């Protein structure tokens, strides 16, 4: 929205609030930016979120929840729970329409992601025990349900992926589905609010396959192997250059934006080889001005032809689900 504002869209913003729960914080952030974008820009998204959590749950608990919410958003940035099926509703003309497919991740990364979600889920549960009774419903709806249901969704899909390859029992995936159903029942019934939000939350919207128990089927192709890199950086790991950090964006929250005709520099130890492959990961988007978004690289002073990474067509949906597009040079 700051990009929209800086591009001159300053009179009217339109927000679709059809699915208002559990997006209360996001709606508040949007409205605060619409009311006084300079105030939000000055304090930053992290501090704005911190103020929200402390207002709702007290200073001590709010501060403890801040890193949990940031990690929740970071993991969801990599892949939202509803996109974990690695399929797309518009693919009705293909042979794998509505068929849950492997995520393009190695066993090592899957285990790392599952461990991160388990830690998050445990911390959220511990914090719940410190919430006063009159705030338990708010805590469940704003924090506990989104974080724990996301964790269980990842467990359901990723344990199923491992089970397809004979690396895990199917029981863990099935148990995660049951946990999502149980959490949703609590959301709708509540603790002390007389079922105020009864039937508000549905854990199987449109009865799409990604929200159902995963079919017990064996994989027909091997799981992806972990790639090995000579060097690997986040955007903000550059040694020098002209850039601005993008708060909250990127798989490690270290994405940057580079002004037109500016550059950043990265260094790595020399290697004995006649060629290298450079893989650049970027945020998928459309041009704000002009008809293309281009990036150019040079290696040891040798210019590599510019590449246009504007995303469009069916492939753009794949990029948007992963919050990244890539250029291989």
Q: Where do the language-model regions lie?
A:
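Conserved small/polar residues in nucleotide/adenosyl-binding loops
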Residues: 318-325
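Solvent-exposed serine/threonine-rich low-complexity stretches and specific carbohydrate-binding patches
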Residues: 304-314
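Short, surface-exposed beta-strand/strand-loop-strand elements in extracellular ectodomains
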Residues: 290-301
């Amino acid at each position: 929205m700051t990009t929209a504002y800086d591009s001159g869209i300053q009179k009217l913003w339109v927000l679709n609030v059809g699915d208002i729960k559990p997006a209360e914080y996001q709606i508040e952030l949007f409205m605060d930016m619409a009311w006084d974008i300079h105030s939000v820009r000055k304090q930053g998204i992290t501090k704005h979120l911190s103020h929200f959590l402390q207002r709702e749950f007290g200073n001590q608990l709010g501060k403890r929840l801040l890193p949990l919410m940031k990690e929740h958003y970071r993991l969801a940035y990599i892949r939202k729970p509803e996109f974990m099926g690695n399929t797309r509703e518009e693919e009705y003309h293909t042979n794998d329409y509505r068929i849950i497919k492997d995520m393009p991740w190695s066993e090592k990364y899957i285990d790392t992601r599952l461990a991160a979600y388990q830690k998050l889920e445990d911390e959220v549960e511990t914090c719940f025990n410190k919430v006063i009774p009159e705030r338990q419903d708010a805590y469940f709806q704003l924090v506990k349900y989104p974080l724990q249901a996301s964790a269980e969704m990842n467990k359901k899909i990723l344990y199923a992926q491992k089970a397809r390859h004979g690396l895990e029992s199917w029981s863990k995936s099935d148990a995660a589905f049951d946990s999502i159903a149980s959490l949703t029942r609590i959301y709708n019934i509540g603790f002390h609010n007389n079922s105020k939000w009864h039937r508000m939350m549905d854990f199987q919207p449109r009865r799409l396959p990604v929200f159902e128990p995963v079919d017990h089927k064996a994989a027909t192709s091997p799981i992806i192997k972990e790639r090995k890199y000579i060097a690997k950086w986040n955007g903000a790991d550059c040694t020098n250059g002209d850039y601005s950090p993008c708060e909250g964006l990127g798989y490690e929250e270290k994405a940057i934006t580079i002004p037109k005709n500016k550059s950043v520099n990265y260094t790595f130890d020399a290697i004995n080889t006649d060629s290298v492959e450079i893989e650049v990961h970027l945020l998928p988007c459309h041009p704000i001005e002009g008809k293309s978004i281009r990036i150019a690289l040079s290696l040891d002073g040798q210019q590599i032809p510019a590449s246009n990474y504007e995303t469009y067509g069916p492939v753009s949906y794949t990029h948007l689900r992963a919050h990244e597009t890539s250029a291989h040079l």
